[in-house]
């Protein structure tokens, strides 16, 4: 593959070649999320509630892995665009080294805090026990998650989306196949219940990492891991974290949001906590494909920005925004037309289904406009502008929605919380456009300094 294809290939075919593999793999991943929750829901409604309460911590682990991976991706893509392959190799080596450290620390911390964390949101001993049993197994694979995500972003940085797609799809499909086998037992496999769901996920994640490693050894890419760069360099570490920390916070903020909304909804009924948990499982089918487009966009934005191709950066942003809007239109339509059927996948309780129908119809009203915030935030990360990207996410997940949900719930109950979603998306979209335009207008020389 031509090293300069990211700045020479026609824009639309380039974007499609970079984003479609990621969209496909994200669709499979979102399907896994839904199927995994479907099987857990068959255990009991308490098991599904436990999964909903554990989700914010799982999301935090993923946020650290993906967020720091975004830093690796952006730094590598920028240096490749600038023609500095040594710095790109240094970023890859030290990025993977730091990913290992993150994985070890989070494994210990997350397993330790889970009992206390769960008791903050429920007094049900059955739910707490199920949550602890699930999290101990799931979080044992945290190191594999962080290293796997670092490799994912490394491959994306060099434009090798096919390897990422194949690795993610193999892991997800393995997970989907193993879920019912390990949860309910089949043949030689014993019935493991909720621990089976966690183990199936871990095995899928391990397979994904194994494929990345095999491909790296058999078919070397343009970026290499070298022993000479193992000793962390201060400038490189600062650069990785200057992008990785804001990106991590971007992705971790939903965990804070979900926990805050759970605390608000607890005052009304645990039914609404379950509804919120189901919504966050269902919305992955919309937002993960959109995220796939953004993942394909980041290295293109970073490479062309590093190469000084500012016009192409603007064109890439506009096309990706349109593609994201198309996905969000689809999400809005299905939430308006079949909310009851979607809720019925996870619960058979009539009251929960009715509450979920109302929630999905109201929240879905904000999907289309959310494409602006999602695309702008991803583009800024690709440009290495982590702080402006973080400001957008703070608006979406903290500054606007939490106060709005709290105030509206005082007047309208749980329905007020659902309305806070679309109100937040409208306000955040306006703020996102302002932040993006101001950030992109700044000179290149101030964007990234050695």
Predicted regions and their residues:
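Structural signal for membrane-spanning alpha-helices in multi-pass inner-membrane proteins
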Residues: 110, 153, 179, 183, ...
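Residue-level signal for short hydrophobic patches within transmembrane helices
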Residues: 8, 12-31, 35, 57-64, ...
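Transmembrane helical elements of multi-pass membrane transporters/channels
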Residues: 17-36, 137, 171, 204-208, ...
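Short runs within selected transmembrane alpha-helices of multi-pass transporters and secretion channels
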Residues: 69, 73, 138-156, 164-172, ...
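Helix-terminus/linker motif at the lipid-water interface of multi-pass membrane proteins
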Residues: 27, 31-49, 118-125, 181-192, ...
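Hydrophobic transmembrane alpha-helices of multi-pass small-molecule transporters
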Residues: 60-63, 107, 175-180, 209-213, ...
């Amino acid at each position: 593959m031509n090293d300069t294809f990211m700045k020479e290939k026609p824009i639309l075919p380039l974007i499609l070649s970079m984003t479609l593999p990621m969209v496909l793999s994200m669709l499979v991943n979102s399907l896994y999320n839904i199927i995994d929750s479907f099987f857990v829901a068959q255990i009991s409604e308490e098991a599904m509630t436990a999964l909903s309460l554990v989700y914010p911590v799982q999301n935090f682990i993923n946020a650290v892995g993906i967020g720091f991976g975004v830093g690796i991706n952006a730094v590598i893509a920028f240096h490749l665009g600038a023609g500095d392959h040594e710095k790109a190799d240094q970023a890859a080596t030290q990025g993977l080294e730091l990913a290992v450290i993150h994985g070890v620390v989070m494994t210990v911390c997350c397993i330790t805090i889970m009992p206390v964390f769960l008791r903050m949101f429920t007094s049900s001993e059955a739910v707490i026990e199920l949550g602890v049993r699930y999290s101990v197994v799931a979080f044992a694979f945290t190191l594999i998650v962080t290293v796997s995500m670092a490799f994912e972003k490394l491959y994306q940085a060099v434009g090798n989306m096919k390897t990422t797609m194949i690795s993610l799809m193999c892991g997800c499909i393995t997970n989907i196949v193993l879920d019912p086998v390990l949860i309910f037992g089949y043949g030689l496999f014993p019935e493991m219940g909720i621990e089976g769901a966690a183990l199936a996920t871990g095995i899928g994640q391990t397979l994904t990492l194994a494929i990345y490693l095999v491909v790296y050894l058999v078919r070397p890419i343009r970026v290499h891991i070298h022993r000479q760069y193992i000793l962390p360099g201060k400038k490189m570490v600062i650069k990785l974290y200057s992008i990785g920390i804001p990106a991590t916070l971007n992705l971790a903020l939903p965990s804070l949001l979900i926990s805050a909304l759970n605390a608000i909804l607890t005052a009304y009924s645990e039914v609404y906590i379950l509804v919120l948990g189901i919504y966050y499982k269902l919305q992955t089918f919309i937002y993960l494909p959109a995220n796939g487009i953004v993942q394909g966009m980041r290295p293109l934005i970073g490479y062309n920005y590093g190469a000084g191709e500012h016009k192409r950066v603007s064109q890439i942003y506009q096309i990706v925004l349109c593609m994201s809007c198309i996905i969000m239109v689809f999400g809005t339509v299905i939430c308006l037309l079949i909310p009851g059927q979607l809720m019925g996948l996870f619960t058979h309780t009539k009251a929960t289904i009715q509450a979920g129908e109302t929630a999905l119809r109201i929240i879905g009203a904000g999907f289309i406009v959310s494409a602006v915030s999602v695309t702008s935030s991803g583009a800024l990360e690709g440009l290495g502008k982590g702080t402006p990207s973080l400001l957008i996410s703070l608006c979406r997940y903290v500054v606007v929605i939490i106060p709005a949900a709290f105030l509206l719930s005082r007047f309208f109950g749980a329905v007020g919380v659902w309305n806070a979603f679309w109100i937040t998306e409208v306000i955040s979209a306006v703020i996102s456009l302002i932040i993006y335009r101001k950030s992109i207008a700044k000179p290149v020389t101030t964007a990234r300094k050695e």
